[in-house]
Amino acid sequence: MVEQRKYKKVYAIEPSSSAIEIAKKIYPDNKNVKYINGFAEEEISKLKLSKPIFFSTMCCLAHLEDEDVLGILKTIDKIAPVDSVLACSEPWGDFYHRECWNIRPPEWWSDTLADWEFEFYNDYILTDPPGRSKGFIAIKK
């Protein structure tokens, strides 16, 4: 994100200290990345934000249970200033749960973040399970 999108500051929250060390070795020159070792719902709540921010989950939330994702989303909602953006490569569609692969319908996301305006994309269709898509953004209103 720093190199391709020219972001001035990226907070990379990761529960695995080993993964952080690997990232630092792969990208040793990324001085604009602040690595934070911890769980998202705990570490996000410590951020002091005064202007809109861009959140990206990549596809991480699909690997977590609903209860954990709810905690993360509620934390984001609590600290995010109006006009903040949440960009997700998360799968969406009919509910589907198996070990480390969880798909939630658009209503689940929009009900959880009621003050956010969502746009779900259909340009990436999943084949496992079929009939689901991947990718959406939301803006806090």
State each model region's role.
Residues 51-52:
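Local beta-strand N-terminus motif with an aromatic residue
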Residues 1-47, 64-71, 75, 85-141:
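Class I (Rossmann-like) S-adenosyl-L-methionine-dependent methyltransferase catalytic domain
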Residues 55-56:
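A conserved beta-strand element that flanks and buttresses the S-adenosyl-L-methionine
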Residues 60:
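Hydrophobic adenine-recognition pocket in adenosine-nucleotide-binding enzymes
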